[in-house]
Amino acid sequence: MQAIALPEEICWLLEDAEDFLAEGLQNENLSPGAQDQRDHILRGFQQIKSRYCWDFQPQGDDLGQDGSDENLSGTHGPALASDASFWSDYQEEGIDDIIRGAQELDNVIKQGYLEKKSKDHSFFGSEWQKRWCVISRGLFLYYANEKSKQPKGTFLIKGYNVRMAPHLRKDSKKDSCFELTSQDRRSYEFTAFSPAEARDWVDQISFLLKDLSSLTIPFEEEEEEEEEDKEQEEMYNDIDGFDSARSGSQGRAMALPEPLDKEEDVYEVLPDEDDLEEDACGAHRRRVDYADYYQGLWDCHGDQPDELSFQRGDLIRILSKEYNMYGWWVGELNSIIGIVPKDYLTTAFEMEGR
């Protein structure tokens, strides 16, 4: 649906009204009735925006509007066609389930206060404005504060590149800056409260971008069916060979081996000494290949049945790196086997040269 074109003055008036309700009355001591009416009107704003495709901006894909940060001339426009598949995943949930209050979001990967660079700031306004920022479900949302009921802006992280950006500032905070850039969408610049915090934001967004680009692993059903057919064919060949041997015996009784007159020695085949280690109690046990063990860098919750969930610090045994080109390995944790994102793991043991 194309956005309905409104006169610029009406757009400004609606923006001012919404901003006053959302932020101007945020900390006011309202009666319960007035508070309910305020929330009701704000929900109406969101529903109207969703119905008429307002605030889905071609530059930045913002949902919601930070009046001091964005250019009002680009406020209203149709959603990008390239992101239609993403928004279709949330059609049943509705816009209210996507745009929630800062404390109502789920699947939060990273959140905290950042300074966001305003696209167009007033003469008296600051170029950098403090915002409560949250990464959730593939979205980057920024709020006026951590108790805000709706974001001042939202954009899709997929399709962006993230990097440290010390060139954004020339003061003492230059090493705490980072930016998200895209070829066909607007850029976003942020300043954290320390260089380490900025690097953590960059790392979290980088891993999320890799995860979004490799959500599915190609699965060739035809190859699996061919392997099953081949196994069945081999089984049938074995049975046919057994039947032909029986038919060639002309129905003779099978000759059983005669019992041994004297008992023969029975020897147990033991593994090589190189494959054994001796523990403190003197008992032998099979050697552990420490190179197969990796440690979780972050918490990872599997969204699919074949994905292995683990927490930071968990020791995971890697069974296969068959899907390495897609960014996934096959691992085992507590006797549970599943695929794990390799970028979430690090080697657990340092191997010394022998």
Curated annotation (Swiss-Prot):
Cross-referenced SMART domains: PH (SM00233), SH3 (SM00326)
Entry's Gene Ontology molecular function annotations: protein kinase binding; protein phosphatase binding; protein-containing complex binding; SH2 domain binding
Keywords: Adaptive immunity, Cell membrane, Cytoplasm, Immunity, Membrane, Nucleus, Phosphoprotein, SH3 domain
Renumbered residue ranges of the record's region Interaction with FYB1: 285-290
Superkingdom of this protein's organism: Eukaryota
The PH domain, residue ranges: 107-210
Sites bearing Phosphotyrosine, chain numbering: Y142, Y236, Y267, Y290
GO CC terms in record: cell-cell junction; cytoplasm; cytosol; immunological synapse; nucleus; plasma membrane; plasma membrane raft; protein-containing complex
Chain ranges of the SH3 domain: 289-350
Location relative to the cell: Cytoplasm; Nucleus; Cell membrane
Pfam families named among the record's database cross-references: PH, SH3_1
InterPro entries in alphabetical order: PH-like_dom_sf, PH_domain, SH3-like_dom_sf, SH3_domain, SKAP1_SH3, SKAP_fam
Cytoplasm found in the keyword field: yes
Modification(s) after translation: Phosphorylated on tyrosines. Phosphorylation by FYN on Tyr-267 is required for GRB2 interaction. Phosphorylation by FYN on Tyr-290 abolishes interaction with FYB1. Tyr-236 is dephosphorylated by PTPRC.
Tissue: Expressed in mast cells (at protein level).
GO biological process: adaptive immune response; positive regulation of adaptive immune response; positive regulation of cell adhesion; positive regulation of cell-cell adhesion mediated by integrin; positive regulation of cell-matrix adhesion; positive regulation of DNA-templated transcription; positive regulation of heterotypic cell-cell adhesion; positive regulation of integrin activation
Protein family per UniProt: Belongs to the SKAP family.
Function: Positively regulates T-cell receptor signaling by enhancing the MAP kinase pathway. Required for optimal conjugation between T-cells and antigen-presenting cells by promoting the clustering of integrin ITGAL on the surface of T-cells. May be involved in high affinity immunoglobulin epsilon receptor signaling in mast cells.
Domain topic, free-text comment: The SH3 domain interacts with FYB1.
Identification of the protein by name: Src kinase-associated phosphoprotein 1
Gene that encodes the chain: Skap1
